[in-house]
Amino acid sequence: IFLSALRDMFKNTPKRQCIVFTGPPNTGKSYFVFSLINFLQGKVVSFMNAKSHFWLQPLADTKFGFLDDATDACWTFIDTYMRNGLDGTPVCLDSKHRNPIQIRLPALFITSNVDVDKETKYSYLHSRLKVFHFHKKMPLDGHGNPLYPITDANWNSFFTKLEKQLDICRSPESDNGESERPFRCCAGEPAGTL
C-alpha cells in the first residue's frame, strides 16, 4: 500500500499527492519522514509560522514538502484553505519580496498525532490523504539513538530495488556501466497511446 501511495505521489496523481503518518508520540513518524525528505532534497514547512502569509513559500521551490506535527489547528487550516492544493489544482502562493505566484503544490508528507482519517470534521480531507498509522514505540538503543537508523544509503537502496514497482526513472548508464549522474527520484514517462 505504501508503494502504491508513493507511486501515485511521484506521478502527481490528483488527490493522491499527500501522505500522512499518524500515531502517538515517540513512534518514529518524524524520524522516518525527515530521513526521506532529506534524501529527496525536499523542504520543510512549519505551522508555527502560520501567522505569516509566507509560511508556505518554501513549497514553491521544491518537488517534495514536509509538514511535521500537524495539530488540530493545522488540520483545520488545511481543511479550510488547502483542499484545492491537495487536489493538485493550481493555487496562488504569496511569496516575500515577490508577486504572488500560481503553482501546483509539491507532493506533501505530513506527520500528526491526530488521527485525521477518523475525525468526521475532516471528512472533506479523507479522499485527499493517504494515511499510514505508526502504533508502536520506535525502538531505541541504550543511548537513546534509533536501533535501526535510516540513512540516505538505505533510501537509495529502497528506491533502486523498487524503481520498477514505483515506476521511477533513472538516468541512462554510460558506456562503462556507471550512471552519468546520481540517482534522482522522478516520475516515469507517460505511457504511449494505443
Q: Regions from the language model: what does each represent?
A:
Residues 28-29, 67, 99:
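Single, functionally critical "micro-switch" positions that shape active/binding sites
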Residues 23, 68-70:
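Walker B catalytic acidic pair
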Residues 4, 44, 50, 67, ...:
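Sparse, context-dependent recognition of short Cys/His-centered cofactor- or disulfide-binding micro-motifs
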Residues 1-60, 178-193:
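P-loop NTPase catalytic core of nucleic-acid-dependent motor ATPases
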Residues 32-33, 62, 108-111:
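Alpha-helix boundary/capping detector
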Residues 57-64, 72-75:
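Active-site/pore-lining binding-face segments in mid-to-C-terminal subdomains
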Residues 20, 64-66, 109:
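Structural motif
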